[in-house]
Amino acid sequence: ANACTKQADCAEDECCLDNLFFKRPYCEMRYGAGKRCAAASVYKEDKDLY
């Protein structure tokens, strides 16, 4: 898995997950086509802009 700091760092079919078991967020494949990433486990791009 690739490390990420925001959702934009990942591919369109991946989510940027911040998991307590890992030292840093990483890109994880989405579960099912078209499903959105859980907001709580994703770095929100709008907050990264500031």
From Swiss-Prot:
Transmembrane segments: none annotated. GO terms for molecular function: toxin activity. One of its GO terms (cellular component) is extracellular region. It is found in: Secreted. Expressed by the venom gland. Belongs to the neurotoxin 20 family. This is U3-ctenitoxin-Asp1a. It comes from Ancylometes sp.
